[in-house]
Structures are given as structure tokens and as C-alpha cells.
């Protein structure tokens, strides 16, 4: 996302770090599931609280959960179930960058969000994306067993 006419990396970084909230919201985009891409006729959507996402990278790779919080200041999201334990035993959400998740079931309660999808030529009615097939689950279990050895 380019805000300034300058091509100097220094000024691009400054614009990025000092971006206002309405521009930070655009930076919080995540890719859509391939089935949703066809249905919505777009590649990505900004992440919102209530979206169901699948984590694609990092320690929680493969985990699916609902977005609990979107932190625009730190450009991170918090997903239900992706928690770590502090030294005192308290469970806290692990911050995840939205580029590392895939939206599998968007929250379409907001009429403005529906309009965004309609504008791009998609249909905003959505059913849940089917779960991973049994074969994929078995392959994942085998990979986990190999990594434990």
C-alpha cells in the first residue's frame, strides 16, 4: 500500500508506522479460502472479530479458531485457542500477523462488509467451508508422529 509519492524506503516505512487507523485496517487483510475466493470474486478481506480463520504459518499452523481481537496498533490478531502460558500460569492469546492466516468463514453481520463483497461481483451468502478431508488429517497425524521421534 503506497501512500506517499516518494519511493524512498525511509519515507515508506515512516508512512507505514505512522499510518492512521483507517489505513491500518486495510493492512489487516488475510487471504480467503479458495472456495470463498470463487464465491466472493476477490482474493482477500480485512480480518474482523468473529471471523473463523485457519493459521497457515508459525507454531499454531493448522489451528482453526475464531478471531477474538484485532489489534490495529500492533497490526496483530488474536485467535481463540492460540494461547501460550506465562510463567505465572496465566493463559494469554498469542499475537498473529493477519498475513499468516486464511479466512475460512467470514463474519457477514455488517451490511457494509456485505456491500464490499457485492461491489466486487461476489455473493455474500456463505456456508461454512468443509473441514479437511480424512486423508489430510491422517497425513498431518503421520507428520506429527515423525516430528516427535
From Swiss-Prot:
CDD domains, from UniProt?
Answer: KOW_RPL26
Q: Where is this region: Disordered?
A: 114-149
- Give the Basic and acidic residues compositional bias ranges: 129-149
| BP terms from Gene Ontology | translation
Q: Which UniProt keywords apply?
A: Ribonucleoprotein, Ribosomal protein, RNA-binding, rRNA-binding
PROSITE patterns from the UniProt entry: RIBOSOMAL_L24 (PS01108)
Q: Which GO terms describe its cellular component?
A: large ribosomal subunit
Extract the GO molecular function terms from the UniProt entry. Answer: rRNA binding; structural constituent of ribosome
* SUPFAM superfamilies in alphabetical order: Translation proteins SH3-like domain
Family the UniProt entry places it in: Belongs to the universal ribosomal protein uL24 family.
Briefly state the protein's biological role: One of two assembly initiator proteins, it binds directly to the 5'-end of the 23S rRNA, where it nucleates assembly of the 50S subunit.
Quaternary arrangement and interactors, per the entry?
A: Part of the 50S ribosomal subunit.
What is this protein's name? Answer: Large ribosomal subunit protein uL24
Amino acid at each position: 500500500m503506497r501512500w506517499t509519492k516518494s519511493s524512498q524506503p525511509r519515507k515508506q516505512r515512516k508512512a507505514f508506522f505512522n499510518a492512521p487507523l483507517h489505513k491500518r485496517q486495510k493492512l489487516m487483510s488475510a487471504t480467503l479460502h479458495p472456495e470463498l475466493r470463487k464465491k466472493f470474486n476477490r482474493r482477500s478481506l480485512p480480518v474482523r472479530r468473529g471471523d473463523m480463520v485457519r493459521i497457515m504459518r508459525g507454531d499454531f499452523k493448522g489451528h482453526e479458531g475464531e478471531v477474538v481481537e484485532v489489534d490495529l496498533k500492533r497490526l496483530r490478531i488474536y485467535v481463540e485457542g492460540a494461547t501460550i502460558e506465562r510463567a505465572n500460569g496465566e493463559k494469554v492469546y498469542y499475537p498473529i500477523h493477519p498475513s499468516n492466516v486464511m479466512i475460512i468463514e467470514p463474519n457477514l453481520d455488517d451490511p457494509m462488509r456485505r456491500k464490499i463483497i457485492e461491489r466486487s461481483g461476489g455473493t455474500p451468502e456463505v456456508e461454512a467451508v468443509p473441514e479437511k478431508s480424512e486423508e489430510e488429517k491422517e497425513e498431518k497425524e503421520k507428520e506429527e508422529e515423525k516430528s516427535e521421534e
